[in-house]
């Protein structure tokens, strides 16, 4: 059975970019050894509503790239520009810590292989919390969370704890949480890593549909080459650089 993911034409303007990374470099220091360069001059641009997949061997730098794009880590060199506004110039962040945290909460959603749902809170509460933290208003947050979860086929599971949900349901809750603040960009790191093939397929088709409907940009790290090939663009990470899949 093949994935049925409709490609779409992202963005509304030829020159408009949601995210632009220019010559990003990241190295890590190792005791008694020269610094290990993980990313070596990464260039990446992502348009509004575009879905980009990144494949590559374990340890090739894919997760490091997502951490930089999500402002969870700092580049050594290069620039990161989000929706036309510079965020990093080299290792210098142009926002204060408070501004950066607020920016990340408003503009970027994250989905991980391990969903990181809070075990003592229901599906509804886990999703609502993403908005509640920023607004302090619980009732409207729960109302919006309920609508979003219903759209993702979880209407009957709102009051269930994560332990009472299947793996596929848990990841759908994680996606709802990532979308709660209407981010312009969602970064996903091996979101189907713990799912069977059926749930993986459903998850990827869901993300492709959301990307199209909401004009939300997605950058997804995956080992699923079948899905990767259905995205608007597939990139391969090797030796700290990106190139087109098959290139």
Swiss-Prot record:
InterPro entries: AAA+_ATPase, ABC_transporter-like_ATP-bd, ABC_transporter-like_CS, ABC_transpr_LolD-like, MacB-like_ATP-bd, P-loop_NTPase. Its main location: membrane. Gene3D superfamilies: P-loop containing nucleotide triphosphate hydrolases (3.40.50.300). GO terms for molecular function: ATP binding; ATP hydrolysis activity; transmembrane transporter activity. Keywords: ATP-binding, Cell inner membrane, Cell membrane, Membrane, Nucleotide-binding, Translocase, Transport. It comes from the Bacteria. The keyword DNA repair does not apply. It is a peripheral membrane protein. The complex is composed of two ATP-binding proteins (LolD) and two transmembrane proteins (LolC and LolE). Part of the ABC transporter complex LolCDE involved in the translocation of mature outer membrane-directed lipoproteins, from the inner membrane to the periplasmic chaperone, LolA. Responsible for the formation of the LolA-lipoprotein complex in an ATP-dependent manner. This is Lipoprotein-releasing system ATP-binding protein LolD 2. It comes from Chlorobaculum tepidum (strain ATCC 49652 / DSM 12025 / NBRC 103806 / TLS).
């Amino acid at each position: 059975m093949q994935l049925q993911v409709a490609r779409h034409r992202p963005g509304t303007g030829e020159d408009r970019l949601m995210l632009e990374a220019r010559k990003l470099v990241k190295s890590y220091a190792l005791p008694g050894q020269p610094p290990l360069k993980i990313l070596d001059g990464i260039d990446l641009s992502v348009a509004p509503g575009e879905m980009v997949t990144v494949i590559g061997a374990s340890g090739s730098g894919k997760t490091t790239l997502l951490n930089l794009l999500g402002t969870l880590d700092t580049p050594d060199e290069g620039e990161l520009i989000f929706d036309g506004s510079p965020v990093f110039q080299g290792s210098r962040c142009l926002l204060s810590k408070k501004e950066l945290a607020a920016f990340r909460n408003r503009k970027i959603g994250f989905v991980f292989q391990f969903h990181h749902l809070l075990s003592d809170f229901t599906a509804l509460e886990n999703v609502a919390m993403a908005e509640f933290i920023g607004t302090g208003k619980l009732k409207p947050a729960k109302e919006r969370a309920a609508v979003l979860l219903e759209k993702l086929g979880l209407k009957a599971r709102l009051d269930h704890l994560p332990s009472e949900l299947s793996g596929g349901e848990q990841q759908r809750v994680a996606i709802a949480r990532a979308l709660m603040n209407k981010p312009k960009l969602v970064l996903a790191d091996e979101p189907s890593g713990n799912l069977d093939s059926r749930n993986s397929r459903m998850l990827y088709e869901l993300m492709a549909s959301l990307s199209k409907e909401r004009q939300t940009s997605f950058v997804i790290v995956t080992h699923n080459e079948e899905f990767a090939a259905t995205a608007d663009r597939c990139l391969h990470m090797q030796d700290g650089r990106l190139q087109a899949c098959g290139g």
